[in-house]
Amino acid sequence: MKDLTVLISASGSPSIPGIIACFKNNGERKIRVVGVDMSDEPSARYMVDAFYHVPAATHPDYCNILLDICKKEHVDIYFPGVSAEVSALVKRWDDFKRIGVTLSVSNSNSVDVANNKLKTYQMLAEAGIPVPEYYPVHTVNDFVEGCKYMGYPQKPVCLKIVNGSGSRGVRIIDANKSRY
């Protein structure tokens, strides 16, 4: 098997040291790891073979900067470490492919569904997979109707923005506890 060079972004993420260890100790081939992060001193900086400080994934030149790093380091596979960059990467899929880099991401439609909680719930429900009860909200009136539909104020209601990652945008509205 040929040796590989893998680029891993978000080198300061808690899971990245374990992922790097898996790449390095894979038992099949030599894997050279290039790390990038928007912090100058991410936790995995000294575990990687090369490191680059990059702007946030939302920066307009982010993909161009990563393309340059991939060319310079002869990257074979780009393994995104943070979901914030995936949407931008899939839009530049062909640019990475053109320089021989495989993006370790799903196609743009799958990314769109996975990054949108409402679309995910709708797709799962259409496939017959049980999902929690939900009510899509787009306006203040939708919000009021949705709260009533979900049983508020007798029952607490959980809100989640459709495009937030992790626990961003999660709110619990409980008439017995909420001051708002």
PLM feature spans:
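Histidine-centered beta-alpha loop that forms part of the nucleotide-sugar donor binding/catalytic region
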Residues: 83, 108, 162
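A short, histidine- and acid-enriched strand-loop-helix "catalytic/donor-clamping" loop
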Residues: 105-111
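Mixed-charge, polar/low-complexity N-terminal
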Residues: 27, 32-33, 110, 116-118
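ATP-binding N-terminal substructure of ATP-dependent carboxylate-amine bond-forming enzymes
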Residues: 1-105, 141
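Active-site nucleotide/adenylate-binding loops and adjacent lid/helix of ATP-dependent enzymes
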Residues: 111-180
